């Protein structure tokens, strides 16, 4: 199942599907953020029982990973199978330890840096 982690990604996913003229199953999610502190306080997955299906969260950037960890925890409550993360830009400013608790694998490009970590699989950008 393809997972869109927040309202911004939901819009991008819908636009992509419109441009392709297809709709691939999409699980939409949302979160609440305190705009003055930046603290995330609530995550919601708009799906029922996922019956052990694998889930791939897709977004543009992962810095600290709090959004993705919160969404992964909610997906687990909905009986998701293995959970994967794909981001174009992987910064991982807090490391990957917390991500290893929630994701089977994380995929990203080397647009930010080359990363040596068993959890991370990078795709090299060739210019």
Model-derived regions: residue spans:
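PRPP-associated nucleotide enzymes
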Residues: 1-127
């Amino acid at each position: 199942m393809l997972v869109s982690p927040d309202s911004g990604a939901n819009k991008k996913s819908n636009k992509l599907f419109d441009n392709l003229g297809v709709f691939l199953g999409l699980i939409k999610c949302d979160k609440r953020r305190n705009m003055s502190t930046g603290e995330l306080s609530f995550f919601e997955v708009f799906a029922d029982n996922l019956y052990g299906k694998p889930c791939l969260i897709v977004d543009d950037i992962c810095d600290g990973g709090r959004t993705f960890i919160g969404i992964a925890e909610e997906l687990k409550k909905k009986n998701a199978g293995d959970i994967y993360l794909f981001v174009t830009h992987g910064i991982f400013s807090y490391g990957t330890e917390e991500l290893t608790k929630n994701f089977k694998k994380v995929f990203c490009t080397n647009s930010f840096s080359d990363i040596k970590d068993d959890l991370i699989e990078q795709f090299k950008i060739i210019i």
